UniProtKB/Swiss-Prot annotation:
Record-linked InterPro entries: CATIP_N, DD_CATIP
CDD domains documented for this protein: DD_CATIP (cd22973)
Origin: domain of life: Eukaryota
Gene Ontology biological process terms from the UniProt entry: actin filament polymerization; cilium assembly; cilium organization; determination of heart left/right asymmetry
Keywords: Cell membrane, Cilium biogenesis/degradation, Cytoplasm, Cytoskeleton, Membrane, Nucleus
Function, in words: Plays a role in primary ciliogenesis by modulating actin polymerization.
Disulphide bonds in the chain: none
Leader sequence segment: none
UniProt record similarity statement: Belongs to the CATIP family.
Subcellular location field: Nucleus; Cytoplasm; Cell membrane; Cytoplasm, Cytoskeleton
One cellular-component annotation, GO: actin cytoskeleton
Disruption phenotype: Morpholino knockdown of the protein causes curved body, a lack of defined brain structures or necrosis in the developing brain, and eye formation defects at 24 hpf. At 48 hpf, show a reduction in number of ciliated cells within the olfactory organ.
This protein's name: Ciliogenesis-associated TTC17-interacting protein
Amino acid sequence: MEESELTQNETEELKASVSAVEFIHIAQRDLEQCLFADSLVTVSDSGRELGDFSVSVTKASYNEELCYLLHANSHGTIDDVPCGTSIVAYISRKLEILEENHHEYVKLEKKTVDRKIHIVRQDDQLVVDRVISEREGVKTQTLKFPLSSLDGFVSEASNFLLLRIMARQKIVPENMTFLSLDADSGLSKSVYKALGWQKQMVGEDLVDIFGIERTIYSANLSSATWHCFFMPDGHLASRVQLGSPAVMKLLHLPFLLDGVIKTFFFLVEKDKIPVMEKKPLIWEEDMELYSKFLDRKEELKADYSSYLRQHPELKALLADFLQFLLLRKPQDVFSFARDFFAPFASQSPPGKSQEF
């Protein structure tokens, strides 16, 4: 394993702007308004559907600290190449990354490139573990960044929350330069700029959308730029990386239900969970035994529901695993599952809620 540690001297020339550091100290009420799900479709220049994209933010807890759980997911086939990205992260109320898992894959004709990145705060450092699997073998690397040099740091996960906040405020202040990681996990600058207003067809409706540009300037790689457009309430309407042959678009307007914005989220729908029919047994005719059975059943359901509420990442983890499994359709499911979870099994998490 390759390991490197960046000292303060090595990172001091990379700093977020004062306005960016001030902006990141966001009022709690602004963050609370960004807790919803977006679901978009990935389409080609000709309008052909290539895949799907979703991102959701919910309340959660991490090592007994109230925080937010973000799950972003993108899967599809671009230029006849299956590919996908999944991000699961715990984000503090100060937009600090507590822990983040980032998984990307590209399934080429003769090989599959698989990249997993795990980010976690440990003591006074941000630790980044990289595992890249290719046909030639597995490469691992650990990077450590002192937290004292990361004021104004925004990861891929916290970027989604930051964009929603800017979109709801309908303004991007001048000189919004944050710190971020490039594709090789090198510390880089991430610059946000307003693109102004334009119109977009969503279903049968013509809506006004506000655009934000994000560019990551890397010292060793070419810069990468994304254009994201949002509806006035912060819902994502379109997203594209410049140079990519695909764009993500919102096909249907979110709808209002009981005063809460709801969107269709494609991962797991609780109403579609199969229910096993109960086989009649003789003991059911005994009122006392049947009453005890119902009491125990409700007790277990409450216990399971409590566990799921305490670990919302379980839904995201299982959904990701099933999607990767169905996309690749391996002959040996057990080996595939072992390889999928192996990079995370060797991690040494500092808190209770970070095992994905």
